[in-house]
Amino acid sequence: MINIPKGTKDVLPSESYKWHYVERIARETADLYCLNEIRTPTFEHTELFLRGVGDTTDIVNKEMYTFRDKGDRSITLKPEGTSGVARSFIENGLFNGAMPLKMYYITPVFRYENPQKGRLREHHQFGVEVYGGAGADTDAEVIKLAYTVLKKCGLSVKLYINSMGCPDCRKKYNEALKGYFADKLDKLCPTCRERYYKN
């Protein structure tokens, strides 16, 4: 008998109604916020994720399902939804249309993680991307949409809002952080040391 691959799960008829319920709430809420659905391929060229996610992240270094296809191209099962949407936005010239362009997706994503209870290698992600919307009002709208979806699903939600700051502030913060760790590198794990030098 052939068993299901490690880190995956069958959605059986006895529980698929729960998936339909959550997906319906996500879609209906996205519709209320005037978002249109976008569907991108389940796999993309690996280079897209190296650029989009960053070559120093755990996703790229440890968690991607990457393989060579019959044409010897490096292909990756998408580990997240944003990169494929950004590629589609550029490749299909969506920037030439009316702005802001607000899109959502519900898609499977894949991460090569250590499977544990509640942690699988195939996930399903609901995501929102807004192009051409500037300022905090766009961020607030996306946060409100996510909050609404979670509340409609019956979850108790408490929001804590933070900011990465402006590019100047981030640069100063990174410099201060690197300064703090400069004399502690021997105490860091190999991955953290690598990030110290790459970031």
Give the residues covered by each predicted segment.
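Extended, charged alpha-beta segments that form solvent-exposed binding/catalytic grooves
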Residues: 1-199
